[in-house]
Regions:
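Flexible loop/turn segments at secondary-structure boundaries
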Residues: 26-27, 199, 286
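Catalytic cores of enzyme domains
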Residues: 73-281, 291-300
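Non-catalytic, usually N-terminal nucleic-acid engagement modules in DNA/RNA processing proteins
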Residues: 1-83
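C-terminal non-catalytic accessory extensions
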Residues: 285-311
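Residue-level signal for secondary-structure boundary sites
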Residues: 50-52, 173, 287
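Feature captures the RNA virus RNA-dependent RNA polymerase
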Residues: 13, 94, 309-311
């Protein structure tokens, strides 16, 4: 059964498959609220194509990241792999409950998800129990937790997305990865165009949303010179130096019309996950990633516009 799961998952796009026995999770973990009879959590990780990030790295094409690395992965590729595995398991008589991210549903009352439009998020939905995805990924042996609260894998660094299947089948466990990739260099923190990550790796979701969507004009080739006219702290916003609140974040996001959203409420990422790119470049330069390429990801000094253009 275990080998068949791995085979089907990889045939349908998964790159890494891991298994966590139920006893790795606290008795109050959400997985047992979702499915009390859970015996194993199956983790599936999928690479995000390195080439998709190159357009943002070069400042030449942005839509491919949002549509191909986020939307199609979350809405098509990953669910298909989950369903194929789950259908095989249920054909064998086991329960298989796929778990994907609820991009527009959250238990918190005043948080947000940078990847989707803030006004498309349904907040305070505590009845919809959700897994701790990063914690489950680590327990499934998919990778380790990086400083900026991102999964790091030996093959692809932070360039992965992942999902799970809960099952009552008892399957042999995958070893938990001993942390060895993240050296707390802080490059992810420094790379954020909106200073949304503190020195301990904690991410402010509203700060992240504003600059994920492109409020930093020095890293946004689509921003007009009259952007945010009339707003207090306009230059600080464009320079990535403004500290936003949930209220001011909403006002800023309402004025970001530089690029159209994708379907399913996914917002176009103008920052391109700068934190992840900086992390990947660092890991590649250290030579610790097992997936090798013929040329380095970063080929030249990072580009940046002059803030004086907006003054």
């Amino acid at each position: 059964m275990r080998n068949k799961i791995i085979e089907i998952a990889k045939q349908n796009g998964a790159d890494i498959v891991g298994f966590a026995p139920a006893d790795r999770f606290d008795k109050n973990d959400p997985i047992f609220q979702i499915m009390p009879e859970t015996k194993t959590v199956i983790g599936l990780a999928f690479r995000v194509l390195r080439g998709i990030y190159r357009g943002i790295e070069e400042g030449s094409t942005y839509y491919q990241y949002t549509t191909m690395a986020v939307e199609n992965m979350e809405e098509t590729v990953m669910p298909m792999a989950q369903l194929k595995v789950a259908m095989m398991m249920e054909a064998e008589g086991y329960i298989a409950l796929p778990q994907r991210r609820h991009q527009q549903i959250m238990a918190e009352e005043n948080s947000t998800n940078p990847e989707v439009a803030y006004d498309a998020v349904y907040r305070g939905r505590t009845a919809e129990v959700q897994m701790n995805f990063l914690d489950a990924a680590v327990k499934c042996g998919l990778g380790e937790k990086g400083l900026h609260n991102t999964l790091l894998t030996d093959e692809f660094g932070p360039m992965v997305r992942y999902c799970f299947i809960l099952t009552d089948a008892e399957l042999d466990a995958t070893d938990v990865v001993k942390p060895h990739l993240c050296d707390n260099c802080g490059k992810c923190v420094k790379a954020c165009p909106g200073h949304a990550i503190d020195e301990n790796g904690n991410v402010d979701p509203w700060q992240c949303a504003v600059y994920y969507n492109g409020a930093n004009g020095t890293k946004n080739p689509f921003m007009p010179l009259d952007a945010f006219d009339g707003m207090e702290d306009r230059i600080e916003i464009i320079a990535g130096e403004a500290k936003v609140t949930p209220e001011t974040a909403r006002k800023i996001l309402d004025k970001i019309y530089f690029y159209p959203p994708a379907q399913h409420a996914y917002q176009c990422s103008i920052c391109g996950r700068s934190c992840d790119m900086a992390c990947y470049v660092h890991l590649e330069e250290k030579g610790v990633l097992t997936k090798k390429f013929k040329t380095p990801f970063r080929k030249r000094e990072e580009w940046k516009f002059d803030i004086e253009d907006w003054k």
